[in-house]
């Protein structure tokens, strides 16, 4: 029996816009200094890992996870200072939460808006849901263009506005007054993405119950738990109840919940790691700025964005680092405003010294 060739069958079954995409690339990091994904470079201490192992042993795997986990919710509220009156929703990282928000709010053709460039998944999740994504360009200095953003909100009437605070990949933290103006202008929901909040020393979380059209979204990925895939959304219970309706059943597996509960009993360890990375950010930025032909942008995250405009452009520098087994994220071709830009995660002092030494050799050759 002969059938239709697989490519033809795929063309009939899979959406054209999906076939035009490429899968999210993840570089092979074996044997490399990994400074490309804003991960915490420090492994958890032995006593924390022991508690994780104990929690995993005691977790029944033959049952589905409970629809709600009041004990874990209480831990998250205490650990991350979520207001007692706020609704709380868990997701598999912030990626799933972005999907849930757009699915709940947007019909095909509705607008999702964000300053741009920013977190790429705002755009992707909107398009996957047949929403229209509007990215409002940042200034040439990669700052928020507030007049343009307010004009775009007025023109496009977005159902959802995403604000990354601080912004990824630029590192900028938009002023409170600008965020306030966007909150006042937005006709729908404003999502305050605080993925990098532990490194910024600034949050909207204590004020979230005063904002009728906003929610705060966070992840634990940047503070040492990237492998766990856990994010949470906080805001008025009425918003959270709507997003909960589109949450997949049993979306948070029992092991992730058990591991998070074990780790949160050691929250000071996570805080200390974040504080260390925050302290090491400026020396890394200063070292980059001292290199010939390098411009460094201010960052409130656990990374630094640098533009290479000397003898070698961003693509060439990225390749040269890769040959030296040092991975950083190349944004040179991602957006015109990011031409020749590389994003470098803050690593351990040894890793930071290694990338600076390698760049010194590369740029002086």
From Swiss-Prot:
Matching Gene3D superfamilies: Aspartate Aminotransferase, domain 1 (3.90.1150.10), Type I PLP-dependent aspartate aminotransferase-like (Major domain) (3.40.640.10)
GO biological process: L-histidine biosynthetic process
Record's keyword terms, sorted: Amino-acid biosynthesis, Aminotransferase, Histidine biosynthesis, Pyridoxal phosphate, Transferase
Chain positions with N6-(pyridoxal phosphate)lysine modification: 222
UniProt-listed InterPro entries: Aminotransferase_I/II_large, HisP_aminotrans, PyrdxlP-dep_Trfase, PyrdxlP-dep_Trfase_major, PyrdxlP-dep_Trfase_small
Record flagged with keyword Amino-acid biosynthesis: yes
Domain of life: Bacteria
EC code(s) of this entry: 2.6.1.9
Cysteine pairings via disulfide bonds: none
Record's keyword annotation contains Transferase: yes
Top enzyme category: transferase
Subunit structure: Homodimer.
HAMAP family named among the record's database cross-references: HisC_aminotrans_2
Name of the protein in its database record: Histidinol-phosphate aminotransferase 2
